[in-house]
Amino acid sequence: MSFDHVGAGAAIWRHFRHDGRVKLAEPPIDVIAKGAFPSSAIWHQACKDVEEAVAEVDWPPGTGSFLLNPAPGRRRDGSKDTYPNGVAPMKVPAIRHLESRGWRTEALPPLPSTVLRTGDLDALYDASGTYVAFEWETGNISSSHRAMNKLVLGLIQGAVRGGFLVVLANSMRSYLTDRIGNIGELRPYLPLWSAATVPDAALRIYVAEHDALSDQVPHIPKGTDGRALY
């Protein structure tokens, strides 16, 4: 399966590409689309919710645009930070929107005791016992691989029928936390995840990018997770 032009969402991509907030850098990537589920009303509604959630993301908050400040910042010790922007605040409006649409946040579907628990999902859609998972990746590239593995494992085990990952475009890497997860470093592994043995499931990646660069906006603040900044 080729991943150069994958997904049925080209029209959606064109719409969000120009609406002024966070943009989709390319058409949605359908890593897995097997059986009847990708054509189901549940999946279509989940896609609609996620696309609307991505479109809610802007910076600075409330401006209706997503602008990144490319100027170097300063670390707590006063040294220059050439990767000045954090990433975790980006997903907050998206998660808030999904929650308003009835998705549960920081949740997992019911799992048998024999199934490995891999940490809560950012959001979970429950359509009368049919579950769809959502992750917005804000960690380093190793974290991005773990997020994809978590989603694929959930599909293989039958815990979820669908999954979404939002990951950042390569164009943002120079302005964000060093080694941030990005589509360029995930793309070579898409055929591996696509080969998962799942008879009736869907897994889609959305690639987000900034609207423009501006040194007139604040840097996106960084948080801490152990020794890592995000």
Per-region residue spans from a language model:
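Long terminal accessory regions outside catalytic cores
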Residues: M1-E52
